[in-house]
Amino acid sequence: MTVHIHPSVDHGVKQGSGHFAGGTLVCKCHDRPVKVGIKGDVAHNHACGCTKCWKPSGATFSVVAVVPRQNVTVLENGDKLKIVDASAVIQRYACTGCGTHMYGRIENTGHPFYGLDFIHPELFQEQGSAAPGFAAFVSSVIESGVKPEQMGEIRARLKELGLEPYDCLSPALMDAIATHVAKAKAA
């Protein structure tokens, strides 16, 4: 049985162009789609197993990356955007028509990822953004209904795709969080 991770990686992870200049994210609406402009390439692109991230129907994981918040601009139909959960650390702006999360923003200036917005690169009209490089919060897919006994197969499939599975973030991102906390304590 084939383990499905996400439509954008199920047939292999497609590498980015290495010179992606940005593009336009488009929601799934046929009428008045929300469009969000992104300047530059994405960073820390990964498969995410958390239950907060938007994912297409049938996907076990979302695919999410970050970009500097100043590189995100709502271009069209921003009146259709609404925050999904105002109490969440990441304020996810979703289209009220189709439910697609267009971007997520952290407003807490003390948060280690303040200044980075979370986006779903599969929504780009253009091709070539940086490819996913790891999988985060892998065990969390159990919370979304995956049977615990399937986890071995899921982790094996992620590794087969070249997406090292972590039950938190990647070591580089965990180091960045710890560095931020240490600097804040020293201040």
Swiss-Prot record:
- Gene Ontology molecular functions: S-(hydroxymethyl)glutathione synthase activity; zinc ion binding
The residues that hold Zn(2+) 1 are 27, 29, 95, 98
Name of one Pfam family that matches: GFA
Catalytic reactions of this protein? S-(hydroxymethyl)glutathione = glutathione + formaldehyde
Q: What is this protein called?
A: Glutathione-dependent formaldehyde-activating enzyme
Q: Which gene encodes it?
A: gfa
Which keywords does this Swiss-Prot/TrEMBL entry list? Lyase, Metal-binding, Zinc
Positions annotated to bind Zn(2+) 2: 48, 50, 53
Q: In which pathway does it act?
A: One-carbon metabolism; formaldehyde degradation; formate from formaldehyde (glutathione route): step 1/3
